[in-house]
Amino acid sequence: MLRIGSHVSMSGKHMLLAASQEAVSYGANTFMIYTGAPQNTRRKKIEDLNIEAGRAHMQENGIDEIIVHAPYIINIGNTTNPSTFELGVDFLRSEIERTAAIGAKQIVLHPGAHVGAGAEAGIKKIIEGLNEVIDPNQNVQIALETMAGKGSECGRSFEELAQIIEGVTHNEQLSVCFDTCHTHDAGYNIVEDFDGVLNEFDKIIGIDRIKVLHINDSKNVKGARKDRHENIGFGEIGFDALQYVVHHEQLKDIPKILETPYVGEDKKNKKPPYRFEIEMLKEKQFDDTLLEKILQQ
């Protein structure tokens, strides 16, 4: 079954219910949320997330699997500032609790940035952090995201992710979130040889680790190490390559999440592209008038 959705907002008083309603309005059967603003630690209590009503709405609409994304402020790769590392460890622990309470099985995490100490030192610190965070009995896997390699990001190569996974004691609690834009920007040829890239991933990490896919086009050429998402079919990856990933036999049951940009020049009135992009990917047919249609909604 094709599981496809997008990032949606969990906010206001309806919280999880609002997120599910937004996803359904896009024709989605899965979705991804942050449990609060990704750039700060302010969070509502678990009992204020409106979980029961949200889960009921999900069930009514055939949504059985959702994803949580950890906030960007978590950086367990930071070797220079102990307080940043400790905040990351503590906050990731509490986010895992919230993820479990919501009923999600995967929390996507940017592995971390070494902030100048070098990739080896950063990876060592990430392993230390994950070993501190992980409870072997937790019901949530941490999905390490494939990164573009912007700045001092760790996890831009499959080898770096494998190194992290191998260093973690209870690595059965680790999975991978494969991001098409990041992988392309890191230098992998997913446009012309996605099967080759997937085979390489399988040899180095194991395809069974992939539990989430982020489906994004890229504003940049392969290997640019920039990480700037583009709407589906309007970037350097292109529609054909992305729809090949979405419908790939080896990835068919994995949730595919769009994180493409809102459309429009007016910053206060940008339009979400997800209903249109999801439909286009389901139909396997590129629509070059898509951006105009998004603006007219």
Swiss-Prot record:
Cofactor note text: Binds 3 Zn(2+) ions.
Top EC class of this enzyme: hydrolase
SUPFAM superfamilies per the UniProt record, alphabetical: Xylose isomerase-like (SSF51658)
Keywords: DNA damage, DNA repair, Endonuclease, Hydrolase, Metal-binding, Nuclease, Zinc
Oxidoreductase is among the record's keywords: no
Name of one Pfam family that matches: AP_endonuc_2
Binding residues annotated for Zn(2+) 1, in chain numbering: 69, 110, 145
Role, per record: Endonuclease IV plays a role in DNA repair. It cleaves phosphodiester bonds at apurinic or apyrimidinic (AP) sites, generating a 3'-hydroxyl group and a 5'-terminal sugar phosphate.
Entry-linked NCBIfam families: nfo, PRK01060.1-1
Name recorded for this polypeptide: Probable endonuclease 4
